[in-house]
């Protein structure tokens, strides 16, 4: 990494800011870990947890990637709908760049866009899964982001309680809850 930095014109590293969309425990730990890792190759990163208003101003309102102030940004996402579309389209479809949605990498890939659009238009579950896999494979190859962490959801309860489930978006469902 130091060699690549030197080749890019930064033989002594550089200073930057690492923005976090959150200030909760996991985000703080991940940001500090990134800060430590970057320091090992000469990049001094100052961590700044953005308040909601700052996030909108500095990240989510920036239409032009050339003038957007974003450089390093830690953000998390879960598909609140449980659908693959909401896991990919708002973050990685070309049409989803700020201020419309959350493609803060300003990522553009025609194959990804076509696969996501095709998946939206079909009702065939197998075809939909195939298209989302194609999109994910392209995204993985391009690496528009560094995918860092997948949080594990943990839920414990009394043996007398059943029917309470943790959903993919970290919410709970109580519709089938039963206390014996």
Predicted features and spans:
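Thiotemplate assembly-line natural product biosynthesis machinery
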Residues: 1-2, 33
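Immediate post-signal peptide segment of exported/extracytoplasmic ligand-binding proteins
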Residues: 2-17
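Short, well-ordered beta-strand elements
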Residues: 13-22, 45-46, 71-72
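Detector for C-terminal structural segments
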Residues: 22, 26-36, 40, 60-180
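Short helix-initiation/N-cap motifs at beta->coil->alpha
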Residues: 22-23, 47-60
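FAD-dependent oxidoreductase catalytic-site/capping-region signature
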Residues: 38, 44-47
């Amino acid at each position: 990494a130091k060699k690549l930095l030197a080749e890019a014109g930064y033989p002594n590293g550089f200073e930057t800011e690492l923005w976090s969309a959150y200030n909760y425990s996991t985000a703080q730990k991940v940001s500090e870990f990134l800060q430590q890792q970057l320091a090992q190759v000469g990049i001094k990163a100052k961590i700044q947890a953005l308040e909601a208003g700052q996030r909108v101003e500095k990240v989510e309102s920036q239409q032009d990637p050339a003038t957007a102030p974003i450089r390093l940004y830690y953000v998390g996402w879960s598909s609140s709908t449980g659908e693959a579309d909401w896991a990919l389209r708002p973050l990685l479809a070309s049409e989803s760049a700020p201020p419309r949605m959350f493609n803060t990498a300003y990522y553009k890939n025609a194959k990804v866009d076509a696969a996501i659009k095709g998946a939206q238009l079909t009702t065939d579950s197998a075809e939909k899964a195939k298209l989302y896999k194609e999109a994910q494979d392209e995204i993985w190859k391009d690496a528009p982001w560094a995918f860092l962490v997948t949080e594990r959801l943990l839920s414990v309860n009394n043996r007398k309680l059943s029917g309470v489930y943790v959903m993919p978006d970290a919410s709970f469902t109580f519709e089938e809850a039963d206390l014996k």
